[in-house]
UniProtKB/Swiss-Prot annotation:
Family to which the UniProt record says this protein belongs: Belongs to the heat shock protein 70 family.
Expression induction or repression: By stress conditions e.g. heat shock.
Keywords, in A-Z order: ATP-binding, Chaperone, Nucleotide-binding, Phosphoprotein, Stress response
Gene3D superfamilies linked: 1.20.1270.10, 3.30.420.40, Actin, Chain A, domain 4, Substrate Binding Domain Of DNAk, Chain A, domain 1
Source species: Sulfurimonas denitrificans (strain ATCC 33889 / DSM 1251) (Thiomicrospira denitrificans (strain ATCC 33889 / DSM 1251))
Function: Acts as a chaperone.
Residues with the Phosphothreonine modification: 197
Gene for this chain: dnaK
Protein name: Chaperone protein DnaK
Region (Disordered): 597-628
Listed GO MF terms: ATP binding; ATP-dependent protein folding chaperone; unfolded protein binding
InterPro entries named among the record's database cross-references: ATPase_NBD (IPR043129), Chaperone_DnaK (IPR012725), Heat_shock_70_CS (IPR018181), HSP70_C_sf (IPR029048), HSP70_peptide-bd_sf (IPR029047), Hsp_70_fam (IPR013126)
Length: 628
């Protein structure tokens, strides 16, 4: 079995690792960094940029730079979180067959496709590091991701050309990375505050077994929300003094977002920061600038309610775990947003001033844990068992719109459970089974995952037919539902895949599209490398002419200069193809080689002549020199 990579597909940043040599190793990207911004950009030239290159041009290309795509992964456009995301980003979120997607210059991309581009880059970086092709991967998701979001994440991996062996929860992966070397039995709490999601998980680690006791969280709460509070504040202050709403200008909004993120980071170590955005907009009076000081105290007052919400989730998780606060030995802080001092203070305070465990790298520990799980699946890591849980209850809609739970929140997975239901009317020929996920009492208030029908039920009075509904959750937390008419033996089953918004046919098409673009990208890369080679050749040849120009025959020099001019002219053409450039490069290369040969022969001749003269003079015993 080939190497298995572990991937933390984050809202703000992503990270990839591999288990080798008895440990999880973080794989640097080609830019030399351990994390890659989860940003994809589409340029006017048709290029697709991923990571740092995409982030660098975000301000000048806000409409076609996609960030925080994880926040709309697996969301229906009708959901409030999709609508909220639409108002916070610089790109256009649209409805595609009921699901949230993005519109880039008239072309619609699903969140799975955008995420696949990020995963593809991580895959390429891993292959460059490992030195061989990589296919198998373990990908992490927030513990509070629902079935639709999990399935969408797995689909993204498939589109990127990955065989996703396992989807595991981020806090569980973190605990795995922390506790692999642990020799003692202990209860740990993982507080995972990332860019767009928050999870808290309580685990018991005992003799290589990692058992999740409880989990809680919010898949739409994270550092992005901290940033947005600063953006709202900056915009309100500027609007108050200048009467201009900067959110109406996509470029200005992107500058606000970048400034907010930087200010948040600075306030983790400083008590005050200055936000200086010159030329943020233009009015009839001329260019306008935004200059504001922001104190940590002011920032903390903005985000206090958000951090308090995370504490409420800790309370829920602790209650469901059945443990007292004193039973928690370690509190592991995971996710870049845990660097915010207020979050650290409030978590420590909740546990009576307990010291937090900051021994793990909050940006890398999730990927490391995923890599360890990859090692477990590959057989490299022995005697480790993960016992995770389903984060939300699963059930079906029954008479009166009630959500009847079949698998309760916090049930250890994998799991399979069944219940018997019946018809609501006499001689009912079919039943529609609506699958829902959530904790609300009525189906309409929960997340709808899918709908399927069991037909040809034998005619009988209401309540007589026995219909067995079975829920089967695999180790990835992905659900399959089946129903069987006990009287006729007829059955129907579905994997809740439609909940991600993509059919198998659509996924296969996207895989092919990704392969197609890979070929295009490869061609584009070859063209860029050829242009770089051409520029270097021109520079070197011109340098040689400058240094040895008087030693080159006039005709040969003219040919070389003509070849340089022709190559420069073709490079000026932005539409020049490889086929146009290559012959010009070849011509100049051959000419420069001839020049080098002439120069070499000239030097050899000069040295030979000098040697002859020296010999002759030596023979005559004559010294030709001037002496002062």
């Amino acid at each position: 079995m080939s190497k298995v990579i572990g991937i933390d597909l984050g809202t703000t940043n992503s990270c990839v690792a591999v288990y080798e040599g008895g440990e999880a190793k973080i794989i640097p990207n080609k830019e030399g960094k351990n994390t890659t911004p989860s940003i994809v950009a589409f340029t006017d030239k048709g290029e697709v940029l991923v990571g740092d290159p995409a982030k660098r041009q975000a301000i000048t290309n806000p409409n076609k730079t996609i960030s925080s795509i994880k926040r709309i992964m697996g969301l229906m456009m009708s959901e409030e979180n999709a609508k909220a995301a639409h108002d916070k980003v610089t790109y256009n979120i649209v409805d595609k067959d009921g699901m949230a997607a993005v519109d880039v210059a008239g072309k619609i991309y699903t969140p799975q496709e955008i995420s696949a581009k990020i995963l593809s880059k991580l895959k390429e970086d891993a292959e460059a590091y490992i030195g061989s092709s990589v296919t198998d991967a373990v990908i992490t998701v927030p513990a509070y991701f629902n079935d639709a979001q999990r399935k969408a994440t797995k689909d993204a991996g498939t589109i990127a050309g990955l065989n996703v062996l396992r989807i595991i929860n981020e806090p569980t992966a973190s605990a795995l990375a922390y506790g692999l070397e642990s020799k003692s039995d202990e209860n740990v709490l993982v507080y995972d505050l990332g860019g767009g999601t928050f999870d808290v998980t309580v685990l018991e680690i005992s003799d290589g077994t990692f058992e999740v006791l409880s989990t809680d969280g919010n898949a739409f709460l994270g550092g992005d929300d901290f940033d947005n509070k600063i953006v709202d504040y900056l915009n309100a202050e500027f609007k108050s003094s200048h009467g201009i709403d900067l959110k109406n200008d996509k470029m200005a909004l992107q500058r606000l977002k970048d400034a907010a993120e930087n200010a948040k980071k600075e306030l983790s170590s400083s008590t005050e920061t200055e936000i200086n955005l010159p030329f943020i907009t233009m009015t009839e009076a001329g260019p306008q600038h935004l200059v504001l000081k922001l104190t940590r105290a002011k920032f903390e007052s903005m985000i206090e309610k958000l951090v308090e919400e995370t504490i409420a989730h800790i309370k829920t998780a602790m209650k469901e775990s059945g443990l007292d606060n004193d039973a928690i030995k370690e509190i592991i802080m995971v996710g870049g947003s845990t660097r915010v001092p207020l979050a650290q203070e409030m978590v420590s305070k909740f546990f009576g001033g307990k010291k937090l465990n900051k021994g793990v790298n909050p940006d890398e520990v999730v990927a490391a844990g995923a890599a360890i799980q990859g090692g477990v699946l590959r057989g490299d890591v022995k005697d480790v068992l993960l016992l995770d849980v389903t984060p939300l209850s699963l059930g079906i809609e029954t008479l009166g719109g009630v959500a009847t739970k079949i698998i309760e929140k916090g049930t250890t997975i994998p799991v399979k459970k069944s219940q018997i239901f019946s018809t609501a009317e006499d001689n009912q020929p079919a039943v529609s089974i609506s699958v829902v996920q959530g904790e609300r009492e009525f189906a309409r208030d929960n997340k709808s995952l899918g709908l399927f029908e069991l037909g040809n039920i034998a005619a009988a009075p209401r309540g007589v037919p026995q219909i067995e509904v079975t829920f089967d959750i695999d180790a990835n937390g992905i659900l399959t539902v089946s129903s069987t008419d006990k009287g006729t033996g007829k059955s129907q089953s579905i994997t809740i895949s439609g909940s991600s918004g993509l059919s198998e046919e659509e996924i296969n098409k996207m895989v092919k599209d990704a392969e197609l673009h890979k070929a295009e990208d490869s061609k584009r890369k070859e063209l860029v490398e050829l242009k770089n080679q051409a520029d270097a050749l021109i520079a070197q040849t011109e340098k040689s002419i400058g240094e040895m120009g008087d030693k080159i025959e006039a005709d040969e020099k003219a040919k070389i200069e003509a070849a340089i001019t022709e190559l420069k002219d073709v490079l000026k053409d932005t539409n020049a193809t490889k086929e146009k450039i290559e012959p010009k490069v070849k011509t100049l290369t051959e000419a420069s080689h001839k020049m080098a040969e002439q120069m070499y022969k000239g030097e050899q001749g000069a040295q030979g002549g000098a040697a002859d003269t020296s010999k002759k003079k030596s023979d005559d015993d004559v010294i030709d020199a001037e002496i002062e």
